[in-house]
Amino acid sequence: MANQLHRSRKVKIVATLGPSSDTSADIRAMFLAGADIFRLNLSHGDHSAVKRRHQIIRKLEKEFSRPICILADLQGPKLRCGDFHNGGVELCLGEKFTFDLNKNLGDKNRVCLPHPEIFQSAKKNHILLIDDGKVALKVTNKTSDVIECEVTSPGFVSDKKGVNCPDSILDLAPLTLKDKRDLDFVCDLGVDWIALSFVQRAKDIKEIKVLLNNRAGIISKIEKPSAVDVFDEILDQSDGIMVARGDLGVELPIEAVPPIQKRLVMMNTLRRYIHLNS
């Protein structure tokens, strides 16, 4: 047992807990198999489930007299389209499609996009991505409440699919009301790190710093091209970074992600900050 727990490796293993790894036996087995950090994903599960997992981890700490790091990952803002009459539509290459603020059910010509911030920042020739990039549309015209597009990558779009805006910096608060409630809850429990989603610029981190009041370290998740562009400034405000390769690969060419990851990790290492890859 002592040999299993003597871990001198520099690279640590982060294990995300969820429904399939939820019991005391599961978490214990993951710890003994080499997990150094347990990630609590606050996008899923209620506070009672988070509290139970937290208690299991802290009991393991006492049992083995070894500190175990807990990382709480905030959900962050989620951008989604509205619902359709028939649950979704097939968008074909070259077709015209419109996003608006009208809450009526969508059809083959339009759908509600209930995020005014996107209408404020979108410009002609900007790209909008739907469903993790499976469908792409180019902005051809826009007003304060309508965005007209042309389909450049066809596919099926269904109710409440995620929307990405790789060309835009959105005037969007990084913390939702849910995030603020979750933040207070996990800080009262006692966690080591908070991962902040949807970081676009350094000022996004300043709000959470005030709310945290030094109760945990801040990991900034790099998942937007705009965050890559101002990485130095983000790093100045953070205690560490997480390179979210899957999210970056939605908004950037997939072949661009590995060299970006390598560069960001190198910059981070020079400052001796913690860095995670997901």
Where are these regions (language model features)?
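Non-catalytic helical/linker scaffolds that mediate oligomerization, partner binding
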Residues: 1-278
